[in-house]
Amino acid sequence: MFAIIQTGGKQYRVSEGDVIRVESLQGEAGDKVELKALFVGGEQTVFGEDAGKYTVQAEVVEHGRGKKIYIRKYKSGVQYRRRTGHRQNFTAIKILGIQG
């Protein structure tokens, strides 16, 4: 059985036992998180209002920061060059089960 969940403005396909990185969530490592399912698949497909009855239980594994990316700006002819970096915060969660 798998489910589609939405958190941080993104959708993820998850199954029991998966560890995924999502946008930063509240809570310490070891805390339990409950997410609503948008779609449930497997032996029987459930979506729409019926999928709202299903919940996905997850546990916070860790908080961290992603790999650094660099953004460069350049304008020709005027010697304008800028480089900035960015590291996105994330939360790793482990999917414990899909219930509904």
Curated annotation (Swiss-Prot):
Superkingdom of this protein's organism: Bacteria
Residue stretches spanning the membrane: none
Keyword list, A-Z: Ribonucleoprotein, Ribosomal protein, RNA-binding, rRNA-binding
Function noted in UniProt: Binds directly to 23S rRNA, probably serving to organize its structure.
This protein's record includes keyword Ribonucleoprotein: yes
Gene Ontology MF terms in the entry: rRNA binding; structural constituent of ribosome
Designated name of the protein: Large ribosomal subunit protein bL21
Keyword hit for Signal: no
InterPro entries, per the entry: bL21-like, bL21-like_sf, Ribosomal_bL21
PANTHER family with a match to the protein in the record: 50S RIBOSOMAL PROTEIN L21 (PTHR21349), LARGE RIBOSOMAL SUBUNIT PROTEIN BL21M (PTHR21349:SF0)
HAMAP family: Ribosomal_bL21
A Pfam family matched in the record: Ribosomal_L21p
Subunit structure and binding partners: Part of the 50S ribosomal subunit. Contacts proteins L15 and L20.
Cellular-component GO terms for this entry: cytoplasm; ribonucleoprotein complex; ribosome
Species name: Deinococcus radiodurans (strain ATCC 13939 / DSM 20539 / JCM 16871 / CCUG 27074 / LMG 4051 / NBRC 15346 / NCIMB 9279 / VKM B-1422 / R1)
Family as reported in the entry's similarity comment: Belongs to the bacterial ribosomal protein bL21 family.
GO aspect biological process, one term: translation
